[in-house]
């Protein structure tokens, strides 16, 4: 377990590691001189210097760069979900990635290593020695106000839970990507959705929540990276993209957004006055970033503050998608890849005369309970489809409040349900 002293040390040391790695791929300009000093790097080309270039500060040295390999327009590519995550991270102004390879998400790290963003945007990419190390690097980098992220799969994310709890308690923003596989234990490398409870209930110790986004396409894998960072920094809270092996490995057309410039140290100091940036740019006095508070009264106040923040997130950030609900008598509730399969089941069932609709939660936390509660007043029942033994069904039941039946259909062991199985489950619900 990290002590408060070690946690603070990480928060202070990691930004210098980030800046050191950034400077390897940059040219230098001293603020009091017009002379330019260029680093010598292979396969690296600098464009004309201008005032539109991204600006970094390291002590009294101003670093500006603009690179020829950065495409400013949208780009359309055929990508795996994992590859889309990596490319979107580079384009959304991510400062650093710290991860460890594990099937079925290893392509995230592999793609970043292949693209070498440290030579284009200055983004740091580091393979940590373990998942435990990577989440604590996230703590340190996020504590400096940087946009930092990690990715893993179910057993690896389980190892990160202590660090995620620390980040939530210290109110440090950051992005965790979980490309789920089957469990428990080492389980299988096949897809699953069995980490729902862990993600939505706060898998570590204490009363906390993580903002959870569930993509159902490769396009959403890309789109949710920037969205997750935006929400994480808006609320000073960890955010998670909860995907699975199906979405991570499937290939689809993706429209990647234009490059968003990484923020300067001055911009970070302005936007994140709480950050330990180490540059003397803070807008207020010394700030200790920690989840530790030994005085019970102060700890209660801190927890009440967190709960108020979570209330605001619930009020403002619920996201969901609906299909064919206008005349629906029964509603399938599913997220991620299970929602894609359920959509096909819904379309086939309607051809057979069944009035079925689809409700897809996009934010698993905050969960769209009020929306489901309203739908329950006009339908006859819900079928919750998951690739697990039944986890989201409890949130659906809480939302419906017993007004109509709520049943579950799922497959285990890395096996995904097929549309015909879902239709049979719908017919049983009708009886």
Language-model regions, residue ranges each:
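Glycine-/acidic-rich phosphate or pyrophosphate-binding loops and their flanking alpha/beta elements
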Residues: 80-84, 307-330, 343
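Thiamine diphosphate
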Residues: 107-201, 211-233
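Structural signature of the thiamine diphosphate
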Residues: 210-267, 381, 421-431
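Conformationally flexible catalytic loops at phosphate/diphosphate-handling active centers
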Residues: 236-322
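Generic long, charged, amphipathic alpha-helical segments
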Residues: 342-375
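Peripheral docking tails and interdomain loops at the edges
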Residues: 386-431
């Amino acid at each position: 377990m990290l002590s408060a002293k070690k946690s603070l040390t990480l928060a202070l040391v990691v930004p210098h590691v980030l800046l050191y790695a950034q400077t390897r791929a940059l040219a230098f300009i001293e603020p009091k001189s017009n002379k330019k000093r260029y680093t010598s790097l292979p396969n690296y080309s600098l464009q004309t210097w201008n005032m539109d270039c991204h600006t970094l500060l390291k002590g009294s040295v101003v670093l500006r760069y603009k690179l020829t390999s950065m495409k400013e327009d949208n780009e359309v590519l055929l990508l795996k979900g994992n590859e889309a995550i990596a490319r979107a991270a580079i384009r959304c102004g991510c400062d650093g990635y710290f991860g460890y390879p594990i099937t079925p998400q290893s392509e995230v790290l592999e793609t970043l290593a292949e693209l070498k963003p440290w030579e284009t945007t200055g983004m740091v990419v580091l393979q940590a020695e373990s998942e435990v190390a990577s989440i604590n690097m996230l703590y340190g980098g996020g504590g400096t106000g940087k946009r930092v992220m990690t990715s893993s799969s179910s057993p690896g994310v389980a190892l990160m839970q202590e660090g995620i709890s620390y980040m939530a308690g210290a109110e440090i923003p950051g992005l965790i990507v979980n490309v789920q596989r089957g469990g428990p234990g080492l389980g299988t490398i096949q897809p699953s959705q069995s980490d729902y409870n862990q993600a939505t209930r706060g898998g570590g110790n204490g009363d906390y929540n993580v903002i959870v986004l569930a993509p159902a396409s490769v396009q959403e894998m890309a789109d949710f990276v920037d969205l997750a960072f935006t929400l994480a920094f808006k609320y000073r809270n960890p955010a998670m993209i909860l995907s699975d092996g199906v979405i991570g490995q499937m290939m689809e057309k993706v429209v990647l957004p234009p490059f968003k410039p990484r923020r300067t140290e001055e911009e970070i100091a302005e936007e994140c006055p709480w950050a330990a940036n180490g540059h003397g740019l803070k807008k207020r006095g010394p700030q200790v970033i920690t989840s530790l508070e030994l005085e019970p009264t102060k700890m209660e106040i801190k927890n009440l503050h967190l709960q108020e923040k979570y209330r605001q997130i619930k009020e403002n950030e619920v996201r969901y998608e609906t299909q064919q609900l206008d005349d629906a008598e029964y509603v399938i509730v599913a997220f991620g890849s299970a929602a894609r399969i359920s959509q096909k089941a819904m379309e086939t069932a309607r051809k057979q005369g069944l009035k079925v609709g689809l409700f897809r939660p996009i934010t698993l936390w905050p969960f769209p309970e009020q929306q489901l509660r309203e739908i329950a007043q006009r339908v006859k029942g819900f079928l919750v489809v998951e690739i697990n033994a039944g986890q989201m069904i409890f949130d659906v039941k809480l939302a419906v409040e017993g007004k109509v039946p709520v049943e579950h259909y799922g497959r285990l062991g890395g096996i995904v349900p097929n549309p015909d199985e879902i239709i049979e489950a719908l017919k049983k619900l009708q009886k």
